[in-house]
Amino acid sequence: MKQSLFLKKCSKFCYVLFAVCGCLACTQNHKIEWPQVTNETKPWTRWWWEGNAVRTTDLDTVMRKYQEANLGGLEITPIYGIHGYEDRFKDFLSPEWVDLFLYTLQEAKQLGLGIDLANASGWPFGGPWVTPEDACKTVAYKTYQLKEGEQLGEPVRYKEEGFVRLAGHTPVKLADLKEPVSANADLQTLALDQVRYKKELPLIIVTANSDKGECLDLTSKIKPDGTLDWTAPQGDWTICALFQGHHGKMVERAGPGGEGDVIDHFSASAIDHYLSKFDEAFKGKDISYLRYYFNDSYEVDDARGESNWTPAFFEEFQKYRGYDLRQHLPALLGIDTPDKNARVLYDYRQTINDLLINHYSIRWQHWAAKQGKGIRNQAHGSPANILDLYAVSDVPEIEGRDLVSIKAAPSVAHTEGKKLSSSESATWLNEHFQSNLGDVKKALDLFFLGGVNPVSYTHLTLPTIR
């Protein structure tokens, strides 16, 4: 019995020993290979072209240094210029600028550096070619109460008092600015952040809703002087008037030739007109080496008030939600029952979400795809489901220092089968000149923990060599 037990133990020992030796032999025969290093596996960097004060001699020098430092690629973002170098400024997308961009693509290809390009000089999308019709909008409103037999005793008008917000230190008075904003000289020095002109806003619609559930469209009863030619019939009536306003957000940090109004992100024609400027600038040019176009987040509402309207909103709302919002303006403005207010507001926000996805993100991605390129998009901050917006992007990109927020872009990349999810890296550290490489490593570690694979440092400037 004891001998049998001993033999069984020996047999088990020999079996385990044989298995271990076999595994060791397999391990010794298997050579572990490090994955191939490409420019996508290396860190990239945002590359400010300050004032587009770029020369080919500068490009030759610094791009070689970037390659020697093992950077994988450069994301070109033209921004505002440096005082004292105005004589070297070049307008974004001008023929001279395009020639320098083509030279950069050629040099990058020779050095094995990738190149991405921001689809704006600064952010968000916008510029001097954006007309007032294509610029971001806001909606203003007035409400009135009437009883049976009463008439409105004041004109239905809304006057925008106007204001100007500045990103720089040059004093600017609203009265000194021409309209549209693109008509003003030296926008680079003015550094405007938001401009709303003092003016009367155009009327969109006037409706009357009764306590019995009736709804009347009174827009045709408004006289040229704003008088409402209507007497309230039986019941208590709520009069709602909507007016279309100019939101006034300007492109942030814009470089020469990029200053101007931000686009209406909810309008398909606005993004089409905007991107046609790039088509025109690059027509007949070889930009095949360009990898992705880039957008540095939504940030339209980084301003006073929100961009919350587009001229075709009523029609789009009915298409997406299946009913006429014009009949429910009291609920939209939050003065109906709490339940109805909440339901209509939800539908309004969902429609904004749909327009931002379908009229902006998807159209932008399709435009890039027709060129054989993709888009990198920072969707955070958008008035929409950012996960859906990230899903449209070829490379979802995130920023920040909160791990849960960081995971948003990589999570979508994972579920949608996208191989890359990038980050705007090391932007938010300590105060200026108080950060060190240890702080940078800590920031990058957090991105890697959150699922980001390629990182894009923010940022490098282009040294202007005298």
Language-model segments: residues:
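C-terminal motif of bacterial Sec signal peptides marking the signal peptidase cleavage site
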Residues: 24-25
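Mature extracytoplasmic enzyme cores
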Residues: 30-35, 42, 54, 58-60, ...
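The substrate-binding groove and active-site-proximal loops of carbohydrate-active enzymes
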Residues: 43-54, 83-98, 254-273, 341-358, ...
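Conserved, mostly hydrophobic/aromatic
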Residues: 47, 108, 293, 368, ...
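Aromatic-lined carbohydrate-recognition surfaces of secreted/lumenal glycan-active proteins
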Residues: 116-122, 294, 357, 361-384
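Substrate-binding cleft/loops of secretory-pathway carbohydrate-active enzymes
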Residues: 124-135, 298, 302-305, 376-402, ...
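Catalytic-core region of carbohydrate-active enzymes that cleave or remodel glycosidic bonds
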Residues: 369, 387-457
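Conserved small/polar residues in nucleotide/adenosyl-binding loops
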Residues: 458-464
